[in-house]
Every structure is written in C-alpha cells, then in structure tokens.
Amino acid sequence: MLDRKLMESLGGWQGYGVERVEWPEDPGRTLSIYLKPTAKVMLCEQCGARCRQVHETTVRRVRDLPIFEYRVVLHVPRRRLWCEQCGGPRLERLAWLGRYQRVTDRLAQACSQLLQSSNVQAVARFFELGWHTVKTLDKARLRASVREPDWSKIEYLAMDEFALHKGHRYATVVVDPIGRQVLWIGPGRSRETARAFFEQLPPGAAQRIKAVAIDMTTAYELEIQAHSPQAEIVYDLFHVVAKYGREVIDRVRVDQANQLRQDRPARRIIKSSRWLLLRNRDNLDRQQAVRLDELLQANQPLLTVYVLRDELKRLWFYQRPAWARQAWNHWYEQAEQSGIAALNTFAQRLKGYLHGILARCRHPLNTSIVEGINNTIKVIKRRAYGYRDQEYFFLKIRAAFPGNAR
C-alpha cells in the first residue's frame, strides 16, 4: 500500500497534506483520503487578496482520479476566509479545485478528454460519476474554450437550418464559409431567429458583410436586407436543384406514371425510377446508368426535365454575370417552350430569384460547409442520444467547428 507521504507527493493537493488514508478491504471499493490544510498564505478566491482570519471550515467530499482499481474520495476541509477587501466571508482559492466543484480539476480534465471521442453516459459510467455531474463539467469547459468570432475579419456568411428533433423543430446555424467557423446558432428558422443573430452583432459587423449564402428562405433574406443592405444574396446550388427535383422531376414522373395505368410494366418502371432521376449521374454505376438512359429515351417529358436540370446547374459556374444572364435567358426560353406545366411554374418562380444566382459570379459562395456541419450535428446527436439542454448542444456544435487559424 502507498504510505501517507508518497500519497501526498503523488496527489499534489497544493496547500493540503494527507492526514490519513483509509484503504478498503475489498477491491473496487472507495479509497478515502483525509486532507488537512497546511498553507500559511490564504488567498481570497474572489479578489486574490491575502487573508489572515478563517471564518469557518466545512468538510467537503471531492472525487479525484481513480488509483488502481479504487475510486478516490477526498475529504477536504474547505475554509471560508474573512476578506477585508471584499468585506465578508469568501472561499479560499485552491489551484486544484474550483468553486462549488465536487471533483478535482484533473478529473474534470480527464472527463473532457474522453468526451471528445465518447458520450456523457459512457464517461459517467467509466468514472462512476453522475450523468449531470459529467455534463456540467463538460459544459463549463466548453463555455471557457469556445472562442468568440473576430467579427472585424468576417465578410462572408452562410446561413442554413437543421432539425433539432423529430416533429419539425429547427434551429438556424450561421457559418463563416471562409474560416470554416460556426459563428452563431439560434432556435427556430423564422425572421425573428435571423433578427436575433444580427442584433447580437458588435457595432459595424453587419456593415462589413459583403455576401450571404442561403437557400431560398425568404425570412433570412428579409432580415439580411434590413440589417446588411449592402450584402448580396447568393442562392445555394444544392437547395435550388433539390427544389427542382421535388417540384419538377418528381411531379413529371408521377404524371407520366399516371398516364400509363393501362401499361402496368411501363408504369412500374417509371414509378420506381425516382432515385435514378434525382441522383447525380456521376454517382450511378454502369448498370444504373444504362437503366437511366433507357428510361429517358423512352419518355420525352422526363428527358426534357432531366436535361434542363443539368443546364440549370451550369448557371452557378459562370464567372461573368453577363454570360450567366445569357445562359439563364436560354434556359428560361427552353422551359417556357417545353409545354410541361410543372417546369413552367418552377421557371416563373425562379425568375424572381435570379439576382441571387447572378451574384454567385461575384461571390463564389455556397452552403456546402453548412451541409457538412449538419452531418456532424447528426453524429453529435446520435452520440449523445439527443440533448435536452439546448445551450449545451449548441456549444458542442461550435466546439466541433472552431475555425481555421487566421
């Protein structure tokens, strides 16, 4: 067994010595270490002033890192000092134990390190701590470590939404697409949510924004125009193409299938082709590509909307607005002359968003980084079996994307 002096040296409980050690008789039980204060200089925890008088002493049970197979409990006489500077009783400042903490700083640090690759429940079980204790430790660490953005260097933003829970509950995430840092997260996806983001910005930050990448959410655009009127809106390719797939390709596929009620084999082929039509051709294997080609050759409306989808994508890759506008006019004319109702309707609606497509030529932004963040958010939720503490969840997300070093 370790003797008292060796235990004192290994423990490193600054300002305290080991009075006695109670070893358990059975393995896996609790090792109790009774400490006694030895520091001659006592400092106020609040102001750091030297104090001479002890107001009161209470014994606190504090968990420390395990020793071998034993869980360690420290019995710490916690002194409250009379501080002349503060004008009242204050706790003594300790280098290894925080105010009101029931675990040592090194145990808290060990929990934080494990939480980077595990979840609260697993870490709590490993150290035999309460779930809420581990969560509180990690939350305090995140509050201290998550750095605030340097708004003086941020000129571009990307805004998107992600699902908080099942049942259509959402939150808005704002990202620096250049520095790859999550800047802000707020509950909801309404104008009020976007307004809350702009209202918390430091003076002058909103006026430095040059462009914001968003989907076609009107709520975001209205608040951007209200708070950063100089910023250009850039509509994201992914969201526009996804909307085209839902409102045009899927609608035409269903209409074509309904026209083939008498030809069940052909109808079955079209009904089961949704995945083939919506997925990028580059992601299809050879057999799937052959099936797609056969389907498009046999159905002119599906071929039309499929080809126009690829033409629509090209609008985002022009570097000159004049060329992009010319390509848009050509695409719009083809859509109008197609005779396909769903395509005509989509083209009419998209015309009102043309400014956000042309702005992509001047500001090559997209929300792809936000989509990557959304995938990480799913992993964080899955690892934690969901988060009931919204602030803790948002801190986890911000910690996962601290940004590139500038």
Curated annotation (Swiss-Prot):
Q: Name one GO molecular function term.
A: DNA binding
Q: Key word Coiled coil present in the record? A: no
What keywords appear on the UniProt entry?
Answer: DNA recombination, DNA-binding, Transposable element, Transposition
Q: Which InterPro entries match?
A: Transpos_ISL3 (IPR047951), Transposase_DDE (IPR002560), Transposase_HTH (IPR032877), Transposase_Znf (IPR029261)
Give the GO terms filed under biological process for this record: DNA recombination; transposition
| Domain of life the protein comes from | Bacteria
Q: What does this protein do?
A: Involved in the transposition of the insertion sequence.
Question: Could you tell me which NCBIfam families the record lists for this protein?
Answer: transpos_ISL3
Q: Which family does it belong to?
A: Belongs to the transposase 12 family.
PANTHER family on file: TRANSPOSASE FOR INSERTION SEQUENCE ELEMENT IS1557
Q: What is this protein called?
A: Transposase for insertion sequence element IS1001
Q: Which organism is it from?
A: Bordetella parapertussis
